[in-house]
């Protein structure tokens, strides 16, 4: 037993006042600063991983890189020295190239002529809008257009514009349905045949071919035509009242149909009154409504502001565009007692004694939309022209107007209209997509052979009363619809969807309204006397262009 070492019991401290050790250990433990953004690596790597060449400090700490923050345990003061306040440049932490564009495979920025210089010749030399790309120092290409919006990032800083509704929604109106534009864009009603004429009224004058020669060197001033255009609603049309007794169950005008069929391109608010009487539906408009005014730059990035008293406000520009369209459509015709006219079967239903009416021919046409839905609409032509084979071709004459190219940041017509007419039309398609689509739909519904577009500009950007004609252009409505990406099957589908929605409702009055601030269509059930207060001024609203010569 003596050969073994004796067993000595270890000393165990006993804490009478608590638990844990009785003596506090040494507190002078050095503190190592750290950074919370450091990437966590492995504690020990037995595989001897090869360090990265591109980012050698990938797993290194980014806190305390300067030597003055390093910890050295020394008891004496022999190593005491002053701290250099300048410090060295800290190593940037490792970050992935998340927001850095990869320029290695960017062909557009390098081109084929050099590593970093864009090839101007390969890009066409100029943009579609007419702005040429300028090359700055060190070969970096920069586009000088839209420089005032370069500070914005994807339009985040753009102010939100709150538009007003076309009609004030009352508390006693009942909301029936809300349909957003993405749902409407998926609709389609194919294989709709061309409309069949059931009545033709009025007369038309022939187009003056001298206006096809108008250009920037040979511009013509726009005259003020003292002619009256009646904008009669659907229910007040005597021909539609006569036809509704024997045929059809849906009645409307071409302006109302084009507004509904092109609703997915609209930004401004509008409304259409619907009256359901048994199996018949009448699509109508309110009295004293601004429904017949043409919008200006509705679909542009920066539409006109609503400034009272300004000639460039949204309402002033709409009035100006409407008068320009009326005057241009009558000026380009061969007017005179000795000039020939094309007469329809019936006289103008809105003719009044002693009133000089505008040259407009009305065609009441019928379409079969399926499921016992028969549409009858009043369409119109503005003129006729002698075809190459001696036949008569119907025209829809419209006018685009330029008010201030610097304010709208668009192509200046007086510089680009003769040489780059496609760029001018592309700019108008971008700024007035809804208006051009409506004109195209109206021409297709009426069966026009040609769509005449005139380019009218102000003589002075500050004068909204005097204008000049800078040129004209013609299209076939069906081909132009394809160019502007207008799908007629979708347009018929949108119309049929709203008609079916109203057909399922009981008899009464309804309102289809475009939401002023959302891409959405709303259907309301309104009282029978909702808009009767506007009917007292029916006569004034029926001819808003009768005094166009006073403006």
UniProtKB/Swiss-Prot annotation:
Family indicated by similarity: Belongs to the eIF-3 subunit D family.
Function in brief: mRNA cap-binding component of the eukaryotic translation initiation factor 3 (eIF-3) complex, which is involved in protein synthesis of a specialized repertoire of mRNAs and, together with other initiation factors, stimulates binding of mRNA and methionyl-tRNAi to the 40S ribosome. The eIF-3 complex specifically targets and initiates translation of a subset of mRNAs involved in cell proliferation. In the eIF-3 complex, eif3d specifically recognizes and binds the 7-methylguanosine cap of a subset of mRNAs.
Location within or outside the cell: Cytoplasm
Listed Low complexity bias regions: 121-136
Protein known as: Eukaryotic translation initiation factor 3 subunit D-2
Organism the protein comes from: Drosophila melanogaster
Record key words, sorted: Cytoplasm, Initiation factor, Protein biosynthesis, RNA-binding
Stretches for region RNA gate: 290-304
Quaternary structure and partners: Component of the eukaryotic translation initiation factor 3 (eIF-3) complex. The eIF-3 complex interacts with pix.
Signal peptide residues on this chain, from the entry's feature table: none
Renumbered residue ranges of the record's region Disordered: 91-154, 527-551
